[in-house]
Design a protein with these regions (language model features):
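Tandem repeat scaffolds
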Residues: 1-217
């Protein structure tokens, strides 16, 4: 598999930070490949459609950055700040997003298959139509998130939700339980109770029990 920039691709806008802009320009001149953007401040950039497969964005500042339809296959984005970033239609297959911040990010139609999202804060994020099959969501905060028409399949889904989360059309199967926040109180819900709670919000999800999970391995 060949990684790097798509033929003729260029950022629609470069980062405001000079160091980050210079690094991005150097990467383009080098012909693409894996971009080392560890810790860089990429705010202000529009990187729509860029190919960042197997690149490094750990601890990078990507708040508000436009990343629509960008490819982050196997990218390391651990600890990155993606608050308010626009990743609509992006591919994050097998990416590492552990401990990243995605508060209020737009993730509509994004592909998270087999991605790792341990400890992610995605409160208020929009996952409308996102593909989350096989992704690991452990200790993730999805309070206030919009999961309309999002799809899961045998996902580790130990997450925190609240009454404002939108689950209309949310479908597939998960390994629970989840924590539901109601004010200052946290309630753990699993099994049939979790299925019913999701159903009451317009979703159709099967919660796989521990015994069923063991039978699958």
């Amino acid at each position: 598999m060949s990684f790097g920039t798509r033929r003729g691709w260029a950022p629609r806008a470069f980062p405001v930070d000079r160091t980050a802009a210079r690094r991005l320009q150097e990467w383009l001149q080098e012909g693409g490949g894996s971009l080392d953007a560890v810790g860089l401040d990429l705010r202000g950039a529009d990187l729509t459609g860029g190919d960042f497969s197997e690149s490094w964005f750990s601890d990078a500042k990507l708040a508000g950055v436009v990343l629509k339809e960008a490819d982050f296959y196997r990218a390391d984005m651990q600890g990155a700040d993606l608050s308010g970033a626009d990743l609509a239609g992006a591919s994050l297959v097998r990416s590492n997003l552990d401990d990243s911040v995605m508060r209020a990010a737009v993730l509509d139609g994004a592909d998270f298959v087999k991605a790792s999202l341990y400890g992610v804060d995605a409160s208020g994020a929009s996952f409308r139509g996102a593909r989350l099959m096989g992704a690991s969501l452990l200790d993730a905060n999805l309070c206030g998130a919009d999961l309309t028409d999002a799809t899961v399949m045998e996902n580790s889904f130990r997450v925190r939700l609240d009454e404002t989360v939108i689950l209309q059309g949310f479908s597939g199967s998960i390994f629970g339980p989840v924590e539901v926040s109601t004010g200052e109180k946290l309630t753990t819900i699993g099994g049939a109770d979790l299925e019913q709670w999701i159903r009451n919000k317009g979703g159709t999800v099967t919660v796989i029990s521990r015994s069923q999970r063991a039978d699958r391995h």
